[in-house]
Amino acid sequence: MLLYVDGIYLSRKACILICCNEENVLGWYLCRYENSRAWEALMQRIAAPAMVVSDGGHGFRKALKRVWPKAKLQRCTFHAFLQVKRYTTGRPKTIAGIELYMIAKDLLIIKDLGQAANWVTRLINWRIKHKTFLSEMTRDEKGKLRPMHERLLKAERSLARLVRQNTLFTYLDESFLDESLSYGEELPSTNNRIEGGINAQLRTMLRNHRVMSIERRIKVGFWWCYFHTPKPLSASEILKVMPTDKSISKLYKAMNERAKLEGSIPTWGDAIVWHELHTSNSYPIYLWD
């Protein structure tokens, strides 16, 4: 089984985590922000896949090791490229920046393990070639000594970290997949299935209705996800288990007051989790109305 995971921020303090396969939404989970505890709560309700594609959301790798330890992770190569682009910009002004930008961009066209090996070699050689340039230092406004080309170093490290974690080219290795599974001609290297499908449509809906309250935005997320599940109930049946604006508002207020809570909707399989101090203590449970 191949799965995709992603998170959508409904507001600055509310995020909905979504997990889907090639056709349907399999689960979603509402949290204040992406963290390993929230990811675990979502993943525990879903059968472990052979491979999961992620954009690198905070806490996901930690949750993956705990809940789906045998699943292979494919880091979305497009997001890996975008992370480099944020540091270099789309028009780098230095030779080192231009070269690193092109190396990152070439991630999007790698089709086999040979090309992947050549790409890794290019990344290593880039660091060697520009070693002197990258080692230049400067002092900031406080007089602290720091790398002059710190943004380039961060960009390179973001790629090198993914290489060490062995999560960039999982899509090129079919040895761990069940022969009965069918994903077409190629395994996915990006999260486009969920980013360009489920999430893109949901983001568009939320963007077109910016004036909606947080309670309504949460309900929109729930409705949208639910209607993309394999066998959704009728609208009248959904209304019987749909959380009300009042119940969402009450719970969201408790979150903002830094209450430690974890609620759930058994019928929907969704919940809200608020966990800031990263302790293992149990917390009180608040159910929806």
Say what each PLM segment does.
Residues 54, 61, 102-289:
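Acidic/histidine-rich catalytic cores and adjacent linkers
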Residues 14, 63, 87, 203-204:
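Short, function-defining helix-loop hinge/capping sites that tune catalysis or transport
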